[in-house]
Amino acid sequence: MQTLHALLRDIPAPDAEAMARAQQHIDGLLKPPGSLGRLETLAVQLAGMPGLNGTPQVGEKAVLVMCADHGVWDEGVAVSPKIVTAIQAANMTQGTTGVCVLAAQAGAKVHVIDVGIDAEPIPGVVNMRVARGCGNIAVGPAMSRSQAEALLLEVSRYTCDLAQRGVTLFGVGELGMANTTPAAAMVSVFTGSDAKEVVGIGANLPPSRIDNKVDVVRRAIAINQPNPRDGIDVLSKVGGFDLVGMTGVMLGAARCGLPVLLDGFLSYSAALAACQIAPAVRPYLIPSHFSAEKGARIALAHLSMEPYLHMAMRLGEGSGAALAMPIVEAACAMFHNMGELAASNIVLPEGNANAT
């Protein structure tokens, strides 16, 4: 059975030759070179992913939603009752939540995964539960390092199993009351930013309670002393099971040489962890949308990412990842279905990259 260390070691590098061939092909399509902008660079990025066999393509699509509760909810950092996590997870199995509707529109399957819901098991939800909620990061660690490592490996294997069954495009999502607090703590640690710069309103926290949330994040970091150079240490000390789960999806997809669409702020924190654990993950990550959560810009700047969509969204669940899946498919369609300049006897002069 593969260990986490072996999985990380075996993440392949992008295929530079395939990317060069893709760029040459795109430059010869029936358009001025570069005129389809980031759709072109996305197609080249996809071409370099070994799991796609050297060409931009999309097979089956899946959004993996990691569901868990958080002990830090007890600190008054969320307005919704904790039971809403379980209620919404059940709603996801019925296809009625935001991510389910958007995923259905994109032709993607939603996998609802319980990695730490504080309730009885829910029919139709994949059970990878570590515990009924993680620890309160304001008073101690979220979980042990061994728990984090075991969950990373389990989710990575689940992701790779889906890849073997034909999934070639993954999206990540989460569900958990109070989870923007540990996400903000992680972003603060990884970027070196003060908590006040990255703490937002989450699911409509009243402005009068923001200062308390900032204080909770600062206390969590001060008490746990996470090492910013050790992604697993940060996840286990100030993260949460849902954040670990999303990180595991990224590691697993990268191991299989396949793309992962990020969602919003929560997924940015997990991406920071994934890239710290294994920098080789970075070329497989695709930013979907620019989260409206306060710390989004700082997290994205640290990841050197510019999302494709600016929709003022902050729902989470993987909604942004699902919404961006058609953009990935559009990049593939451009690559395979457009005509070629040579076939139409069109010769463009040099310097037409910005033509419209």
Swiss-Prot record:
GO terms for molecular function: nicotinate-nucleotide-dimethylbenzimidazole phosphoribosyltransferase activity. Its EC number is 2.4.2.21. It is an enzyme of class 2 (transferase). The active site is at residue 317. It catalyses: 5,6-dimethylbenzimidazole + nicotinate beta-D-ribonucleotide = alpha-ribazole 5'-phosphate + nicotinate + H(+). Keywords: Cobalamin biosynthesis, Glycosyltransferase, Transferase. It holds the Pfam family DBI_PRT. CDD domains: DMB-PRT_CobT. It comes from the Bacteria. One of its GO terms (biological process) is cobalamin biosynthetic process. Pathway: Nucleoside biosynthesis; alpha-ribazole biosynthesis; alpha-ribazole from 5,6-dimethylbenzimidazole: step 1/2. Homodimer. Catalyzes the synthesis of alpha-ribazole-5'-phosphate from nicotinate mononucleotide (NAMN) and 5,6-dimethylbenzimidazole (DMB). Belongs to the CobT family. This is Nicotinate-nucleotide--dimethylbenzimidazole phosphoribosyltransferase. The gene is cobT.
